[in-house]
Amino acid sequence: MFNKVIMVGRLTRNVELKYLPSGSAAATIGLATSRRFKKQDGTLGEEVCFIDARLFGRTAEIANQYLSKGSSVLIEGRLTYESWMDQTGKKNSRHTITADSLQFMDKKSDNPQANAMQDSIMHENSNNAYPANHNAPSQDPFNQAYAQNAYAKENLQAQPSKYQNSVPEINIDEEEIPF
């Protein structure tokens, strides 16, 4: 099954950082996101969604260091269902996001150290790469911000793979490609 969540929103509270017995960092953030729509009567409506997200490792520590209530972030991860019994024996449940990566969405700050973290944090805990056409112009501000911050690094070079020499090179003329 495919379980992937991408959400842009603002923090509803400061980052709550804890350390697990193993010494690894774990953080919880509250995220608010909204959707605007036109109602049947023609008036504009807004629907707000509040959800918690879990961050782990270095991503949790960086979030704690650079984010605060009101900060805008993009989170990629998976939807997780949590259930527990409270002290009265009542069963509770909720959905949360377990983050694989995080990206700051606020304007670049005057702090160069924060800017460096903003440029690199997205792929901290994720090996995923999206084959998006990030060079194509877009009118959607979300896509523009995502493309500029995540994929505008033209100077990055791929890490050499130990399998790189085992794949034969295929010499095909572009005229032969059917699409």
Swiss-Prot record:
Skewed-composition ranges (Polar residues): 157-168
UniProt-listed PROSITE patterns: SSB
Single GO molecular function: enzyme activator activity
Extent of motif Important for interaction with partner proteins: 174-179
InterPro entries, A to Z: NA-bd_OB-fold (IPR012340), Primosome_PriB/ssb (IPR000424), ssDNA-bd (IPR011344)
A biological process term (GO) from this entry: DNA repair
Cellular component terms (Gene Ontology): nucleoid
Keywords: DNA damage, DNA recombination, DNA repair, DNA replication, DNA-binding
Segments of this protein annotated with the region Disordered: 157-179
Domain SSB: 1-106
Keyword DNA-binding tagged: yes
Function, in words: Plays an important role in DNA replication, recombination and repair. Binds to ssDNA and to an array of partner proteins to recruit them to their sites of action during DNA metabolism.
Quaternary context: Homotetramer.
Protein name: Single-stranded DNA-binding protein
Name of the coding gene: ssb
